[in-house]
Amino acid sequence: IDIDRAEINKNIMIDQPVIGDVKEVLTRLLPMINERPADEWNADIEALKAKYPLTYDESALTGPYVVEEIYRATKGEAIISTDVGQHQMWAAQYYKYTKPHTLLTSGGLGTMGYGLGACIGAKMACPDKTVINIAGDGCFRMNLQELATASRYNIPIIQVVINNHVLGMVRQWQTLFYGKRYSQ
């Protein structure tokens, strides 16, 4: 959906473009959606999770372990934001989200540095909630100015940095798909 016809097919080819104001378009589309209960689908997903549980090396301080400990400490009641990288995947997989609007992430958009600003915004919107940003060392270096903002305005957020001394997801892809040809 885009209000500007010139944007359609500009960067990627669109199968079904919709030209218009997003509010108006969605207002017209929403009544056409038939709500389907997801109970059966959710049960299937839970069965797959039970059959193929996520595992990691529990003898070392790993990213998944850190995320699970954050979950235990917060009893799942925190709002979690993430930057981009392996820590983002661990936060999505190892923190057990049970409520909507408790995972703030840019998904696959690759926006390093997103998490801390999102964390600050969430804390401003929900001052009574514990709000935690989970970042890797690479992402953490992207936005120290936001940390200064949180400090200056006394915004009580929690910043967790999972430091593996490398851009972890980039390194993982180079290992898996590029014959261990690493960029420096």
Segments (PLM) and residue ranges:
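Glycine-rich, acidic loop regions that bind phosphate or pyrophosphate groups
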Residues: 1-44
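Active-site diphosphate/adenylate-binding microenvironment
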Residues: 46-123
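Thiamine diphosphate
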Residues: 89-167
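Fold-independent oxyanion-binding glycine-rich loops
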Residues: 1-4, 21-22, 44, 70, ...
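Short helix/loop capping segments that flank catalytic or ligand/cofactor-binding pockets
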Residues: 8-11, 27-28, 90-91, 143, ...
